[in-house]
Amino acid sequence: MKGKGEQVFRLESSYEPEGDQPQAIEALRQGVMDGQTNQVLLGVTGSGKTFTMANVIAEVNKPVLLISHNKTLAAQLYGELKQFFPHNAVEYFISYYDFYQPEAYIPTMDKYIAKDLKINDEIERLRLKATSSLLSGRKDVIVVSSVSCIYGLGAPEDWKAQIIELRVNMEKERDSFLQELISLHFVRDDSDLAPGKFRVRGDVIDLVPMHEESALRVEFFGDEIERLQLFDHTTGEIFEDEEYAFIYPARQFVAGREKLQQAMLGIEDELAHRLNVFRSGEKFVEARRIEERTRYDLEMIKELGYCSGIENYSRHLSGRKAGERPYCLLDYFPEDYLVIVDESHVTFPQIRGMYAGDRSRKTILVEYGFRLPSALDNRPLRFEEFETMVPQLISVSATPGDYELRRSGGSVVEQLVRPTGLLDPEIVVRPVNGQIDDLLEEIRKHTGKGFKSLVMTLTKRMSEDLHDYLRKAGLRTRYLHSEIKSLERMQILRELRTGEIDILVGVNLLREGLDLPEVSLVAILDADKEGFLRDSKSLMQIAGRAARNVEGMVVFYADRITASMRYVIDETERRRSVQRKFNEDHGVIPASIVKSVDQVLDTTGVADAEDRFRRRRFGLEQRSRRGIEDLVGSLKREDLYAMAEELRLEMQEAAESMEFEKAAYLRDEVTKLEDAAEEKRESEGGMDSG
């Protein structure tokens, strides 16, 4: 067993581990210290899994990569861990695109869709800060990431080789320093100092590193650095003098001049071979296309050291062989680090599926002369490659998948007791015959107490019909399924959270953030129809939606008990027994979680002021019947920004599903909304100044 050694992480919290958190923390810590490569934390909904993870991180004394399956959850985890570890390097690494339309070609329509994107400067800064912290040699680094961590990056040794070290009294020529900044892709701008830019005023050079919020002033005296100062590039306020400073590249893909020359030769050779292939096959259009595009890129690389889409040449830049795995964020970690995969039952399948989708899209681009074959090596990791790069793994889920359980070899740590003392909701089975009347009666019992209900149906048509039936019965209800657009979907979820409706009917309610303490009833119609959304893991997940209420209850409507139902019923009863015994032994009285509307909105990631939400509703409801142009006049600036954000999410889903035309259409709508919002901002600013 390894000793604990000096603590590198400082966990700050007003809470102490409760329930069975202490045992879970110790078991996971011991497993990491003993060198176990795979562990599973099976933590029920509401048991405080994030706090347990934070305590384990505080004990293991090694860098940590925490992977979440979507940006929203990653942002929540990042915020929580920043609070837990204010003195350590908690970093954030997700896709830096506000919107991203990948390059694609549709042969059946002879339609090429150019790559279109908008980079979020703040997220790009946070990504660079993450890689900078990892390469700095610090051990107290926690990186919270989406699956972006498995996508290609520049080689860490190339990136590290480009770092500029500055020290007071160091000999360095001013002009050579300027050339170094340009080689790191900093841009000179003497009028607008911003991240990734520098300005020159005689012997004083000011710059804003991409990974820092403060600017750096470098004062020269002859060929010597006389002074280094940190300052606010907006106000000019001087913060402090520094003895030394490190300047990191302003882009993820960088290479020295020698490597660039080698890469260009490799690209030339590949182009020549590809032209022979096309011409011998009498594909002259494709040959002309690939030659024009590649020659243009080569000219840009020669002149600027960079080109749009340079990542597609990453194999040449890093000197890799065809088919060799790309460098990614995991390469920036030291050999000894810990990976925690949150919601592993969802995250692992997502990681597994990234490679195939990327490959199919790029193969078409290569076949039709839009890209060289080496572009195929700018890709996410294959799942088996990901596995080989993870030295130690903790998978976290309320319903771990077969993969995690098999890899752990039975090393499963359970966290079944909630700090609130709440038991898992009781599950009852009732017959299908008369299920609607029984459901109506049950819903009325729960709504009479001020609680909410979730109802899962088998089909979209059933959800709509049941919604109509409940509404005619005088209940406040809405339905939700895949045909409802993102804007309306968000509106419906807000109505549930703000108490404007009491019942939500849907086919798949697992994808929504519906962990609301007011939900006391979960009803699953036709629970015995084994298959998607009626398997054991889905049933367990949806049953957990009622786990935050002391009167939580789950009803399976079925004529027989399937193997999946039996597993969920037996497992729930086992957990209830453990929870009940703990409460009795420790004198804990179960209590529902109580949250205000504002708290609920905030914790579920839809924190809009209620009045803004009400003002925006008209626009949300009318979007399907009116064009964007008609809406902009009736909406306020902040509402236009909010609508653009919702459409951006819908656009990203379309792009990931390879619905490129839909994504392009939504991109145009986003642009219209943002342009309209900017016009309103400028006009409002003009009115204020007048």
From Swiss-Prot:
Keyword ATP-binding attached: yes
UniProt comment concerning the protein's domains: The beta-hairpin motif is involved in DNA binding.
One GO CC term, this protein: excinuclease repair complex
Signal peptide: none
Short motif (Beta-hairpin): ranges: 96-119
Keyword field contains ATP-binding: yes
Pfam families cross-referenced by the UniProt entry: Helicase_C (PF00271), ResIII (PF04851), UVR (PF02151), UvrB (PF12344), UvrB_inter (PF17757)
Entry superkingdom: Bacteria
Protein name: UvrABC system protein B
Organism: Chlorobium phaeobacteroides (strain BS1)
Gene: uvrB
One GO BP annotation of this record: SOS response
Sequence ranges assigned to domain UVR in this UniProt record: 641-676
